[in-house]
Structures are given as C-alpha cells and as structure tokens.
Amino acid sequence: DPATGKLDAFWDGGFTGNPALFPFYQPRFPRDIVIVNINPLMRDGVPKTPVEIADRVNEISFNSSLMAQLRAINFVKKLHQEDRLHDRVMANPLIHMILDDTLMNDLTARSKMMPAPGLLARMKEAGQAAADGFLDEHGDALGDRDTVDLRALFAGSEVVG
C-alpha cells in the first residue's frame, strides 16, 4: 500500500474460495446460515459470445467452493433426516440465501474487477432491498426451518421458497 508502506497482500475470497461453513455445524452456534449471493447460481440460456462465456466461467469458478460446501450440508441434513446423526454431535443447519439475481445477471465479470462508485451504490441499495425482501418473506423461518431446498438445488429445480 503506497499510502501506508504496508506490504501485506489481500485477496478477495472469490479468488481462493468461500469460507468454510462446517465450523457452523457445531451445536453451540445458532443453526441459521445466511448466504448472501454475489453471483447468480443459475442463468437462463446459454452464453454465446466470448465475453458471455468468460463471465459464466468466472461465475461457475467463484461458486464452485460454495456449491461444495452446500453439498456437504445437504449430506449432513440427510444424515439427520435418517436419524444417523444427532444435534449434540453436529447441528442440522438451517440454510437461507439472500440474492438479487436480476442485478447480478446484469453485471459482467469486468464490473466486479473495476467497481465504480455508482455501481457500488447501486449494489448496496440492491443488497439492502434484497435483505429487506428476504426478511419480509422469510423472517419467520429464521431459527425454525430452511428457506433453501438443497435437494432441489442439486436436482436443478427451484431452490428458494
């Protein structure tokens, strides 16, 4: 950093992967895990141009560690459902997602590399609206039930509802 002279490097999680979710399986933590998506999980249609293809590859790469974590949670939930795992050993997490795929589908990978103040303001406003919408629609589910159907996610069906 030229301003401070510090030589430490910082990399956004998207370059290395999302933080691990398994520490949250511990019974001492609240069961709710709220994921705030910054990349769409799915898109309608097939990318055709080189830019669209590169953007989708970027999204898939960025989401790959999240999807692996969600598959692990799906397995834990299956073990709980079959009474092969108990809460005192590993919690049965409740999964929620806050997303704004409309905005995220409009953005390209380049917009994430060179964010402009106007874009950041737009994303902040969209994020606040998405969080408010999530709480309005699913606030009563917190602490009680999932708002994401992981089985449907991995079967390719509707995931949030």
Where are each of the predicted segments found?
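Ligand-binding cleft/hinge of the Venus flytrap
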Residues: D1
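Non-catalytic peripheral regions of patatin-like phospholipases
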Residues: T4-G161
